[in-house]
A protein has these predicted regions:
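Hydrophobic alpha-helical segments, especially transmembrane helices
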Residues: 13-14, 79, 109
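Secretory targeting and sorting signals
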Residues: 1-37
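Short acidic, glycine/serine/threonine-rich helix-capping segments at coil-helix boundaries
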Residues: 66-72, 82-129
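Intrinsically disordered, low-complexity Ser/Thr-rich linker and spacer segments
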Residues: 126-145
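Short, functionally important structural connectors and interaction interfaces within domains
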Residues: 22-23, 55, 88, 111
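Acidic, Ser/Thr/Pro/Gly-enriched interdomain connector segments
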Residues: 2-8, 33-90, 141-167, 171-192
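A broadly tuned, weak detector of single residues within folded domains
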Residues: 16, 30, 71-74, 97
């Protein structure tokens, strides 16, 4: 057998399995379901809700050092930590780093939660409870939207974290205390 025939036969032996693998991978990629939103509890890509905003945080996903680490939801959480005195204003950057983890653990411990430094379902639920009690939330339904003032008792009304969402349900937006800009509380992007 000539060297060119041997080479051709060897190439066919390699090419056929490679082609079959490429076809299989292409079919798998074409039929794969799209990636789920990063929010692990309700599948939404944003903090969202319907009806009264007081219970909107009860099913939110985690933000921590390994999940949704850089996101607008992390930025939202950092605004809460800032208002409660656990994080400096300069620490509001939408990136869940060591300072945010430490502040989160302190916030959790002061509220009798497991101080693991991860803002997950129990932590967001606790923050949501505070909307209706200690944090003096009020709602205004002007313009077809809820406008909620989120503030600890020691914070003046004019310094509250402003939060809004459509009256009939949808994504939350908040006024970032560091930048003064409105941000949609998204898990998959960081507009902090």
């Amino acid at each position: 057998m000539s060297s060119s025939a041997l080479r051709s036969r060897t190439l066919r032996r390699i090419a056929v399995p490679l082609a079959a693998t490429a076809v299989a991978l292409g079919v798998a990629a074409a039929t794969a379901t799209p990636a789920a939103a990063s929010n692990s509890y309700n599948g939404n890509a944003y903090i969202s809700g319907s009806d009264t905003p007081a219970d909107d945080l009860n099913d939110e996903g985690a933000v921590n050092m390994s999940t949704n680490t850089v996101s607008s939801v992390t930025c939202f959480w950092q605004n809460i930590l800032y208002l409660d005195g656990y994080l400096s204003k300069s620490g509001i950057d939408g990136s869940f780093g060591p300072a945010t983890k430490t502040a989160t653990a302190q916030w959790q411990g002061d509220r009798g939660l497991s101080a693991d430094g991860s803002a997950g379902k129990a932590t967001f639920t606790e923050a949501g409870i505070a909307f209706g009690s200690n944090w003096h939330w009020t709602e205004n339904t002007s313009g077809g939207r809820y406008w909620v003032g989120y503030r600890p008792s020691h914070v003046p009304v004019e310094s509250a974290l402003e939060v809004t969402r459509p009256f009939d349900g949808g994504a939350w937006s908040f006024l970032n205390k560091r930048t003064g800009k409105w941000v949609t509380a998204a898990y998959n992007t960081n507009a902090c």
